[in-house]
Amino acid sequence: PNTFCILAMPYGSYSTKNMAIKNASKMMKESGADAIKLQCGKDSVDIISAVSAAGIPVMSHVGLLPHLVHLYGGFKMQGKYAEDAINIIEDAIAIEKAGAVGIEIEAVPAEVAQEIEKAVSIFTFSIGGGSAGNCQLLNGYDLIGGFNSFKPKFAKRFGNVADVATNAFKEFVSEVKDSSFPDLEHSYSMSPSEISKLKQYLESKSKI
């Protein structure tokens, strides 16, 4: 009850104002979330405004927008150059003016995130934006080391589940190959009397 839950709307579910209001309303009702989050900036403030005007607490996203990662050529830091940084800051300002209650800042230089925090008065949380923001966010799989092949620069691993999982699969394959698994401990069995009944039945069927 004391946790503020934000529900990220799926890609393509808020392409128009009417679609955004309809889907956001449904998702809020069904999930019990406290707010919904879109991934759009100043080019889509009309959608943010429409959702907000419908009485739905809405947040948005600046910097790296995962829904648009194909436009960046991959998961890459945004705002490296001053011109790009200005656009990101302007996005944040426009998002606030459109009625959003908060902004996620993702994968931007710490200096840019700090300027965003200065430029807006709404709630901010940062993932890959340095120490700026009202709170810090990390994806669970990054935090526990769920992947070996993909690791964002901003993600510190507090565990290494990937190695544990990989070793478990290797042991499974090895034991299957040498027939040590499955063993009696990990197998179901019938009582001797039931086995006898089964064999008698099968033998009688084979004689027909």
Residue spans for each PLM region:
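Alpha/beta enzyme core
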Residues: 1-208
